[in-house]
A protein has these predicted regions:
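Short, acidic, metal-binding catalytic loop of nucleotide-sugar glycosyltransferases
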Residues: 25-34
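A conserved acidic beta->alpha catalytic loop
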Residues: 26, 41-50, 66, 94
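Glycine-rich, basic loop-to-helix element that forms the pyrophosphate-binding segment
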Residues: 64-81, 91, 102
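Short aromatic/hydrophobic "clamp" motif used to bind/position activated sugar donors
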Residues: 86
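Conserved donor NDP-sugar-binding/catalytic core segment of glycosyltransferases
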Residues: 93-130
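Short, flexible, basic/aromatic active-site loop/helix in glycosyltransferases
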Residues: 135-156
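A short, conserved alpha-helix in the catalytic core of glycosyltransferases
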Residues: 156-174, 179-212
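Non-catalytic, C-terminal membrane-associated alpha-helical segments of glycosyltransferases
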Residues: 244-308
């Protein structure tokens, strides 16, 4: 049962005790006293859960019995959250004390699903990559990037570890799709589902958080597997989400190019990613069937948001 006016903070963490030691005090300082904080310990081996129990007994800790990765850990934490608004933060994010002041007013609009935060470089205070993400369809695939313009409120996607959202809409959309395991594209997919279902994604540059970008995935997977998972999930993103006949035809036309030239350029990684994605095609189509009942906005209209 959701509790009106309660804010829940969910922080997934794997072997991130050193990051929580650094950033958790700022998280607690920035939240209203009535907020609840949930840390999902993703089967860490660094004593995270015991450290939290000793130093922050009021924080709820979800202890995964095995390593479930980012998406599933977030889903578990959000399912436990009682607040109407959930703030999802990576363990390497350090929010400014007043960052929520410019975020919460956006949720007075019931059509707003999520609000993204303005990420800044923690060293000199200059914006590194911001928090506003856009996308375009090119060469048969959906590519994503962060534009130089980090002041415009319109966005196509937000970072899953640096945003707040309406839990009721999250539940309706189904949360992070585990189709995109073990990592990558789940946050972009969820934002896409929200936009296609008629909801709004907002970027709020005044909501400042410092993001240290200490990549757990790089340590876990290495660069080759990261490229493999990213390409696999890029294909699955198209197969699950794109409904425009023109874009789907374009995807088929460009596939031979990618299967030959992109495979050569990536030293075989794309071909492996394609076959891995193909194995998951039935799952992607099942997921597509589930979410497509909510779709009311065309792909073309979503891509236009990148031009605003």
């Amino acid at each position: 049962m959701l509790v009106p006016n309660l804010i829940s903070v969910v922080i997934p963490s794997y072997n991130g005790k050193h990051l929580l030691e650094k950033n958790l005090p700022a998280v607690l300082k920035s939240m209203p006293s009535s907020s609840e904080v949930i840390v999902v310990d993703d089967f860490s081996t660094d004593g995270t859960a015991d450290w939290l129990a000793k130093n922050y007994p009021h924080i709820k800790v979800v202890r995964n019995s095995k390593n479930l990765r980012f998406g599933r850990s977030c889903n578990l934490g959000v399912n436990m959250a009682k607040g109407e608004i959930v703030v999802l933060l990576n363990n390497d994010v350090n929010p400014h004390s007043d960052f929520l002041l410019s975020v919460l007013p956006h949720f007075k609009d019931n059509q707003v699903f999520a609000v993204g935060f303005g990420e800044i470089n923690s060293v000199d205070g200059e914006i590194v990559s911001g928090g506003r993400g856009v996308s375009k369809f090119e060469r048969g695939l959906v590519t994503h990037w962060r534009p130089k313009d980090q002041k415009t409120s319109s966005a196509i996607w937000l970072s899953g570890g640096s945003m707040a959202f309406n839990k009721g809409i999250w539940n309706k959309l189904g949360g992070f799709d585990e189709l995109f395991r073990p990592a990558y594209e789940e946050d972009r997919d969820l934002c896409w589902q929200a936009l296609k279902s008629g909801y709004k994604i907002v970027f709020e540059p005044k909501a400042i958080v410092e993001h240290f970008h200490e990549s757990t995935n790089l340590k876990l997977f290495g660069k080759t597997k990261i490229s493999l998972y990213s390409l696999k999930n890029q294909l699955l993103f198209v197969w699950k989400n794109i409904s425009s006949p023109w874009y789907l035809l374009n995807h088929l036309v460009w596939l031979p190019y990618h299967l030959i030239l992109t495979t050569i350029r990536t030293k075989g990684i794309f071909l492996t990613a394609f076959f891995w994605a193909l194995i998951q095609l039935p799952e992607a189509l099942k997921s597509r069937s589930r979410v497509s009942r909510l779709w009311i906005v065309k792909d073309e209209e979503i891509f236009k948001l990148a031009e605003k």
